[in-house]
Regions:
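A charged, aromatic-enriched C-terminal amphipathic alpha-helix characteristic of glycosyltransferases
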Residues: 114-146
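Short hydrophobic beta-strand element within catalytic cores of glycosyltransferases
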Residues: 85-88
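Acidic donor-binding loop of glycosyltransferase active sites
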Residues: 55-68
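Conserved active-site histidine-acidic residue motif and adjacent donor-binding/catalytic loop
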Residues: 44-56, 92
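Glycosyltransferase donor-sugar binding loop
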Residues: 13-28, 43
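Short hydrophobic signal-anchor/transmembrane segments that target glycosyltransferases
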Residues: 1-12
Length: 146
């Protein structure tokens, strides 16, 4: 599905994290990706150190999460903190969760390569800090136990 969305775009590189999960599935994704996109498809098959992975995420422009289950929320939150444009399937619980919180994420049905507006990027960064700051976490823990 995701590959069908990207096939018509020329000046892109596609990075596919395949270092976790089922190896057979990862191999099939790699094979299909290379067949459809050639050297524009880069399979990430080994784990990176945390600092390397954050640097990698900081260098991408757009992230697409085309799964129907709530997965990769840690990556999504890091990408929000980095001000990246995130596409999700609007029929998923994580799309619903994030939009109800007020994050500006995008429906994959409307995919384009337009850059993230700075105002949207800053909104997401500030909202993330507001909702998940150390102070907010302490407040949440206190209210839970009182």
């Amino acid at each position: 599905d995701c590959f069908d969305i990207l096939v018509n775009f020329e000046n892109i590189n596609i990075y596919a994290p395949l270092s976790y999960g089922d190896k057979k599935y990862a191999d099939s994704i790699k094979h299909i990706g290379i067949a459809r996109f050639g050297n524009k498809f880069i399979a990430l098959e080994s784990f990176m150190r945390f600092d390397e992975y954050i640097a990698f995420l900081n260098n991408i422009d757009i992230a697409i999460f085309k799964q129907n289950r709530q997965q990769a929320m840690g990556n999504i939150f890091v990408l929000l903190a980095l001000g990246k444009k995130i596409y999700l399937d609007s029929a998923t619980t994580h799309y619903d969760f994030l939009t109800k919180l007020g994050f500006r994420v995008f429906d994959i049905a409307n995919f384009n390569l337009e850059p993230m507006l700075e105002v949207d990027s800053m909104h997401n960064k500030n909202l993330l800090l507001k909702l998940y700051s150390k102070e907010k976490q302490i407040e949440n823990q206190r209210s839970f136990y009182l």
